[in-house]
Amino acid sequence: MARIAGVNIPNHKHAEIALTAIYGIGRSRAQKICDAAGVVRSAKIKDLTESDMEKLRDEVGRFVVEGDLRREVTMNIKRLMDLGCYRGVRHRRGLPLRGQRTRTNARTRKGPRKAIAGKK
């Protein structure tokens, strides 16, 4: 398995798909990386030369991916919580942020229902 940005890239997949194993790289960004590196999108990772892999590593290195991106997202959420703004309060309480209703639904964000004693 090849390693790019500290992630093992699957050998049996096409370059375009294999790059999506890296956190922060989706299909469209993977296509742009392949084009910029001059690598054929449909080429399997195991068939690429070491120079092709080096080009891919250089192109991926231009983006914020993996640990740095996770840290950045976490810090952004922490900043909102420290500010005490509406979105930060919703993060702190574990409720939806974007205006969804919470009287019913919102179970994914709120977690499983809490049993109410004496109900029935």
Curated annotation (Swiss-Prot):
The gene is rpsM. Signal peptide: none annotated. This is Small ribosomal subunit protein uS13. Located at the top of the head of the 30S subunit, it contacts several helices of the 16S rRNA. In the 70S ribosome it contacts the 23S rRNA (bridge B1a) and protein L5 of the 50S subunit (bridge B1b), connecting the 2 subunits; these bridges are implicated in subunit movement. Contacts the tRNAs in the A and P-sites. Keywords: Ribonucleoprotein, Ribosomal protein, RNA-binding, rRNA-binding, tRNA-binding. Part of the 30S ribosomal subunit. Forms a loose heterodimer with protein S19. Forms two bridges to the 50S subunit in the 70S ribosome. It holds the Pfam family Ribosomal_S13. Belongs to the universal ribosomal protein uS13 family. GO terms for molecular function: rRNA binding; structural constituent of ribosome; tRNA binding. Residues 94-120 are annotated as: Disordered. SUPFAM superfamilies: S13-like H2TH domain (SSF46946). The keyword rRNA-binding applies. It comes from the Bacteria. The keyword rRNA-binding applies. InterPro entries: Rbsml_uS13_C, Ribosomal_uS13, Ribosomal_uS13-like_H2TH, Ribosomal_uS13_bac-type, Ribosomal_uS13_CS. It comes from Azoarcus sp. (strain BH72).
